[in-house]
Regions:
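Short Gly/Pro-enriched loop/turn and capping motifs at secondary-structure junctions
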Residues: 251-253
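Conserved mixed alpha/beta catalytic, RNA-binding, or beta-rich assembly cores of soluble enzyme
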Residues: 2-7, 11-12, 17-57, 73, ...
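Glycine-rich phosphate/pyrophosphate-binding loop regions near the starts of catalytic domains
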Residues: 58-69
Length: 296
C-alpha cells in the first residue's frame, strides 16, 4: 500500500472513560436493534455519552449461548457519577425494553472502578428485583411484563482514547457511501475499536458563533462554500465531499490499527482522491498523532 495521496498532517484525540458491555438476545434482529439503538446519538462533544458497536458474536461465543453484540459507551472527562447517569438512559430505554435481552460487563482489563447497576437500572423493578448467580456472574433480575430482564451487578469503568479520525476526500456520493461502509466494516474487525459516528458528514471545529448549540460546521471544509469563501476555503481541486470516520478505542495501539485498516480499505475505492484528518492546531484534543506515522 502506498500513501502518496495521504496528507502529512496530524489528528487530535483525548482520553476518555468507557464501559464495554455485551448485549445478548434470542435473535440477531433483537440484538442488533438493542446494540444500535443504545449506541446511537453520539453526544460526548456536548458532555453526554456516545457509543458504538464493536463486534457481533455467535451463540457459541457468549456466556448464555445466545446471539451477542459487544458495545462500548464513552464519556470524556472524569465525572463518573454523570457517566453512570447518562449511561442509565441507554441501558433502560434502549435495551431493557427489548424483549428477552440481557447485559453483561465485558471489560477487557482489571479496572477497580465500577458503575453499580442496581441504583441506575436494577430499581426499574420497583423494589421487586433480586440478585441471582448465573453464567458465573452476579446478575440483577428485573421483573418485567415479558419476563425477565437481567443485567450484571457491576460494570467496570476503563480508560481509553477518543476522537481518533481520518477524512477521506471524495469525488462522488458513491465513494462516500461505499468506501465509508467498507471502512466501518474494517474497523469492526479490530478488537477494542468503535466508530461512534459511522460515516460522519459534518466535521466540526473548536470555534463557533453559536456556543449554545455545541460544535458547528467546519466551514472552510464545506464544498458548497468553496466559491463563497474564495482563498479561505481549504477544499481541494476535484473534492466534492469530505466525510469523516471517528475512532474510539481501548488503547492507542487499537486506535492506530483501526485507523490504518479503515484508511487502507478506503483507498481502494474509485472516487476517493485523498486522505486527511482533523488538525485543529491543538485546540481540540490534548494528544496528537501523525497520520503517516500510523499508516507506514
Amino acid at each position: 500500500m502506498t500513501y502518496e495521496n495521504v496528507e502529512d498532517t496530524f489528528f487530535e484525540a483525548f482520553e476518555g472513560k468507557y464501559v464495554r458491555a455485551l448485549i445478548t438476545g434470542p435473535t440477531e434482529e433483537i440484538v442488533k436493534r438493542a446494540a444500535y439503538d443504545s449506541t446511537s446519538t453520539p453526544s460526548a462533544v456536548i458532555g453526554r455519552v456516545e457509543g458504538g458497536v464493536e463486534k457481533f458474536l455467535d451463540k457459541n461465543e457468549t456466556p448464555d449461548g445466545r446471539y451477542g453484540a459487544i458495545v462500548q459507551y464513552w464519556l470524556g472527562g472524569d465525572d463518573v457519577e454523570k457517566f453512570a447517569f447518562e449511561l442509565s438512559y441507554r441501558l433502560r430505554q434502549d435495551i431493557l425494553v427489548k424483549p428477552f435481552t440481557r447485559i453483561f460487563d465485558y471489560s477487557n482489563n482489571g479496572s477497580e472502578e465500577y458503575v453499580e447497576m442496581m441504583d441506575i437500572v436494577g430499581h426499574c423493578g420497583d423494589g421487586y428485583e433480586w440478585i441471582v448467580e448465573e453464567y458465573g456472574r452476579k446478575m440483577i433480575n428485573v421483573p418485567i411484563a415479558v419476563p425477565d430482564f437481567q443485567i450484571e451487578e457491576k460494570f467496570r469503568i476503563n480508560e481509553g482514547i477518543m476522537g481518533g479520525n481520518f477524512w477521506y476526500l471524495c469525488e462522488s456520493q458513491e465513494a462516500v457511501l461505499n468506501a465509508g461502509r467498507a471502512a466501518i466494516d474494517a474497523i469492526m474487525d479490530v478488537e477494542g475499536a468503535i466508530a461512534p459516528f459511522e460515516i460522519c458528514s459534518a466535521a466540526s471545529k473548536p470555534e463557533t458563533n453559536y456556543p449554545e448549540i455545541g460544535p458547528t460546521t467546519n466551514h472552510v471544509y464545506c464544498p458548497s462554500l468553496k466559491e463563497k469563501l474564495g482563498n479561505d476555503s481549504k477544499v481541494g481541486e476535484g473534492v466534492n465531499y469530505i466525510p469523516e470516520i471517528v475512532i474510539n478505542a481501548v488503547d492507542v495501539e487499537s486506535m492506530n490499527k483501526a485507523l490504518k485498516s479503515g484508511v487502507d480499505v478506503t483507498l481502494d475505492f474509485e472516487g476517493v482522491i485523498g486522505i486527511s484528518a482533523g488538525n485543529y492546531d491543538g485546540k481540540l484534543g490534548d494528544k496528537t498523532y501523525n497520520l503517516l506515522d500510523i499508516l507506514k
